[in-house]
């Protein structure tokens, strides 16, 4: 084969060759900027539909129930998107996180410790701030949990649109932080707001995860084992009362990431390569389409300015996340238990900390579980405003910093 012919071909992680000059729609969807644009477009469409004459049709479709009742899976379309489809996104996130922990940016112990410490700070500080501001107000005893969450899909979407110039370490830090943060939020929901937690279902899920790990260890590759196993694990986690997306994270982290000598790519790399376009181009946008459709009530927006709980949510997400994530990261590095990711400056970490304030869907869920009636509506409005404000501030910080970097400003 001539050199020019070799340049026209490439080999993907599945070992297949394709033309480098032909348009590859899957590769197009793997582009982070494209995925971010599709995600935000879907979220914008959802907000328009939920606040337009089409609101009733939108709500009818979102709330349409489908699924087998005998498995307790008679869920609405919106719930299938939130609990089912999003589990695949979390599986891809788990694959990426496992790869970074074993052979990537997080292989160093101190570098891996930093996002965990940052996530803990990003949960504790917003919760303390929200509790202090809302103390004594109706619902404040439970509403402190609302700003502890970070919406991983939307935070990564904003980063992909405005911070594509940043090194890989930035995405890895935010991904790791958000995964730990979401796991923390799931624990909060399970402990405080779940009445029917099933230990038997949790044990079944743990046993299925053990089978998955053993199959990986034995180098079994057939999808006829893994697909039913993954579905069964998801059903078990869902039946336990815990947010079912944790099944995706668990299986992703249990997938083998080192390739054997006879393999062109590891199972984790192959799965990530195959699922990434579906995750970015379909799964996350569909999730956003049904999750972001929150009616924006003018009266609720006005009323929230006089509601201490709503104010506590905004301050917790916008200020608490920034202070908690950045402050705990700074302390961890200074006392030597964490290491700043390669290629990132403190101002970069401050922008990533600001992205942690994009609570959105997880915070909306906690608001729904912890409050009722008008108080819940005001808290939801506060989550929307806080998430939008955090996104905007982070975008401005990233774009300004990116412009300086591209212009070769040494002090950037």
Swiss-Prot record:
It comes from the Bacteria. It catalyses: Na(+)(in) + 2 H(+)(out) = Na(+)(out) + 2 H(+)(in). One of its GO terms (cellular component) is plasma membrane. GO terms for molecular function: sodium:proton antiporter activity. The keyword Transmembrane helix applies. It is a multi-pass membrane protein. Its main location: membrane. NCBIfam families: NhaA. HAMAP family: NhaA. PANTHER family: NA(+)_H(+) ANTIPORTER NHAA, SODIUM ION/PROTON ANTIPORTER NHAA-RELATED. This is Na(+)/H(+) antiporter NhaA 1. The lineage of its organism: Bacteria, Bacillati, Actinomycetota, Actinomycetes, Pseudonocardiales.
